[in-house]
Amino acid sequence: MERNNRKVLVGRVVSDKMDKTITVVVETKRNHPVYGKRINYSKKYKAHDENNVAKEGDIVRIMETRPLSATKRFRLVEVVEEAVII
């Protein structure tokens, strides 16, 4: 899975409406530089999903790759955990 020094992120799929593209939100915690309080940060990434296997709510692992479109810089590596459908 390690290819050069590419970023590997784990996040939750929030949209799978596009063809071969998913939107993944990655949540991180960081300390405030002055006050030291833990703050939640979240960032959305568009990732390439060649076979449309990821569904909304899934936990996925994405890896940095060459630019695939104007906004896509990541590709789907694996679905870590499938969403529970009630």
UniProtKB/Swiss-Prot annotation:
Pfam families: Ribosomal_S17. GO terms for cellular component: cytosolic small ribosomal subunit. GO terms for molecular function: rRNA binding; structural constituent of ribosome. It comes from the Bacteria. Keywords: Ribonucleoprotein, Ribosomal protein, RNA-binding, rRNA-binding. One of its GO terms (biological process) is translation. One of the primary rRNA binding proteins, it binds specifically to the 5'-end of 16S ribosomal RNA. Part of the 30S ribosomal subunit. Belongs to the universal ribosomal protein uS17 family. PANTHER family: 40S RIBOSOMAL PROTEIN S11 FAMILY MEMBER, SMALL RIBOSOMAL SUBUNIT PROTEIN US17M. This is Small ribosomal subunit protein uS17. The gene is rpsQ.
